[in-house]
A protein has these predicted regions:
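Transmembrane helix-boundary elements of multi-pass transport/secretion proteins
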Residues: 1-62, 68, 78-79, 167-168, ...
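Membrane-spanning alpha-helical segments of multipass transporters and channels
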Residues: 55, 66-67, 74-197
């Protein structure tokens, strides 16, 4: 249970974040319309819409870690606070990907299909049950695109090895690459807004 559940729950958590982001964006589009919702600044409007959900997703992440390592008293070699900190950029990148999927089409059903295809292999590609070095190049590339793959490396380094905070958080540096999807999301939102005006 400790080996599998500690990876399955974060994989499901990633899916929850991406899908919830899509649903929030779809609800705002439906209830307010693009112009009223995003004008005059799509970036500010998206931050105003999505940032209130970051603490909610973070509390979910905190809850499963506390459940694992305090409630079930699974062995923990490191510090939970390092993992709490590692969850914040993971959440932001999952939300960025959910936003990109939504603004690619403005169609919630199609965006949900993209999100499902993207996140479905999360558990298999994490490198927990199958070594990353033995994965095909395609699987390794897909794994590198999944935010939770980088978080799980941080979790393993802290839980199993008690690594320093800096070493653990260095596993998250690839998440800086998700600034590109965030930028793409803003460009797509602005393009849809300009088309709607």
């Amino acid at each position: 249970a400790q080996f599998l559940v500690s990876a399955i729950i974060p994989a499901l958590w990633q899916i929850v974040i991406v899908v919830s982001t899509l649903l929030v964006l779809a609800a705002n589009q439906r209830d307010h319309g693009l112009v009223r919702w995003l004008a005059p600044s799509p970036g500010v409007a998206l931050c105003r819409t999505l940032l209130p959900y970051v603490p909610l997703f973070w509390l979910q992440g905190v809850a499963f870690l506390v459940w694992f390592y305090s409630g079930l008293q699974w062995p923990m070699q490191g510090n939970l606070w390092v993992l709490f900190a590692a969850q914040v950029p993971t959440i932001l990148e999952c939300m960025a990907m959910g936003s990109v999927f939504f603004f690619l089409t403005l169609d919630p059903a199609r965006a949900m299909s993209f999100a499902g295809a993207f996140t479905a292999p999360s558990f298999a590609f994490m490198g927990i049950t199958f070594p990353v070095s033995d994965m095909s190049p395609l699987a390794q590339a897909w794994r590198s695109l999944l935010p939770i793959s980088h978080y799980i490396e941080a979790q393993v380094s802290q839980v199993s090895y008690g690594a320093s905070a800096l070493t653990t958080l260095m596993h998250l540096t690839p998440l800086l690459g998700y600034l590109l999807p965030a930028l793409l999301c803003l460009l797509l939102a602005r393009r849809h807004l300009n088309s709607a005006i």
